[in-house]
């Protein structure tokens, strides 16, 4: 009986340990708080926070949302996303959009090599210098010299498109 009780206690602690796995890297500022949509603007209808992630319910959503956090033009942006099967969304950076989706099913196929299957978390990174971004998906370069301009005033946004989507651990670091 003691062994069973001990095992149940250990199993009960596993989800709590996973929730704490994320550690904010030095110099980064987190744009989502995992609790609500504070710090985000736009038409918030259909957007919510579920299980610590910004959730897009595409059937309810009316528009895109944008971070209210101001930043300079030379930055590193990191976030995690999870797409429902066939889902399509996007991340706006300085006014330009990178399609974020279930790449193996929805394309573009040239990104599929780096993507995890629908329903799994993917890590996306934008390293922006003087209006050009290198974009990595799960550590693999998917765009080497994406010209995005340097209009930091247009900020960071999340797109409403097709299928349910989750975003979490959205963070930014000013480059020196």
Could you describe each region identified by the protein language model?
Residues 19-176:
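Carbohydrate-interacting regions of secretory-pathway proteins
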């Amino acid at each position: 009986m003691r062994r069973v009780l001990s095992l149940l206690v250990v199993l009960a602690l596993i989800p709590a340990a996973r929730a704490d796995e994320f550690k904010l890297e030095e110099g980064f500022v987190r744009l989502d708080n995992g609790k609500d949509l504070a710090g985000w603007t736009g038409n918030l209808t259909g957007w919510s926070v579920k299980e610590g992630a910004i959730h897009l319910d595409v059937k309810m959503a009316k528009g895109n949302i944008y971070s209210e956090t101001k930043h300079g033009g030379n930055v590193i942006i990191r976030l995690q996303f999870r797409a429902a099967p066939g889902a399509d969304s996007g991340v706006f950076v300085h006014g330009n959009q990178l399609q974020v989706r279930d790449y193996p099913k929805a394309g573009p196929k040239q990104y599929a090599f780096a993507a995890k299957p629908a329903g799994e978390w993917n890590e996306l990174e934008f390293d922006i210098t003087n209006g050009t971004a290198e974009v990595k998906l799960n550590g693999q370069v998917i765009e080497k010299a994406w010209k995005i301009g340097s209009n930091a005033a247009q900020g960071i946004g999340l797109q409403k498109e097709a299928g349910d989507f989750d975003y979490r651990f959205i963070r930014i670091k000013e480059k020196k």
